[in-house]
């Protein structure tokens, strides 16, 4: 249903819906929204198809995550309406060399919803040589 709706209405409706669901603390500017809409123009059908296939795709990838031998910092918004925080915990459990940060009172776009905390997380992660703990 939604794939048909967004195919008919196009990227603006798709992005508007995502913004309503994805942010708790941040309101993107008109310029940011326009840029985001432009990036999805003509691609809404394939993008919604990708989202529909996401759970199946994870089944193919998940078994290989344990072999990933690089530090990974998983970050997530606690109130993510698209991908629940339980997904972050599962991903963290599958990655042998990972850290997990779940931002409280935060939606899907945590890099904007909690920009100060996110910036500090990245700064610390990079400055500490991607070390865990």
Language model segments and positions:
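Short alpha-helix in the alpha/beta-hydrolase fold that links the catalytic acid
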Residues: 32, 61, 70, 84-93
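Catalytic active-site module of serine/aspartate enzymes centered on a nucleophile-bearing elbow/loop
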Residues: 97-133
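Flexible "cap/lid" loop of the alpha/beta hydrolase fold
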Residues: 1-8
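Short beta-strand/loop motif that positions the catalytic acidic residue
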Residues: 68, 74-76, 80
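Active-site acidic short loop of glycosyltransferases
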Residues: 42, 69-70, 96-97
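Acidic catalytic loop of the alpha/beta-hydrolase fold
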Residues: 55, 79-83
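Short beta-strand segments
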Residues: 51, 75-76, 102-103
């Amino acid at each position: 249903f939604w794939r048909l709706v967004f195919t008919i209405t196009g990227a603006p409706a798709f992005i508007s819906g995502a913004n309503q669901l994805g942010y708790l603390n941040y309101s993107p500017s008109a310029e940011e929204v326009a840029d985001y809409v432009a990036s999805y123009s003509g691609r809404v059908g394939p993008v919604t198809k990708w989202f529909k296939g996401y759970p199946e795709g994870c089944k193919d990838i998940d078994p290989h995550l344990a072999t990933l031998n690089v530090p990974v910092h998983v970050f997530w918004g606690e109130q993510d309406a698209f991908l629940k925080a339980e997904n972050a915990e599962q991903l963290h459990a599958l990655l042998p060399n990972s850290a997990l940060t779940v931002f409280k009172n935060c939606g899907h776009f945590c890099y904007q919803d909690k920009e100060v905390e996110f910036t500090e997380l990245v700064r610390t992660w990079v400055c500490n040589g991607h070390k865990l703990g």
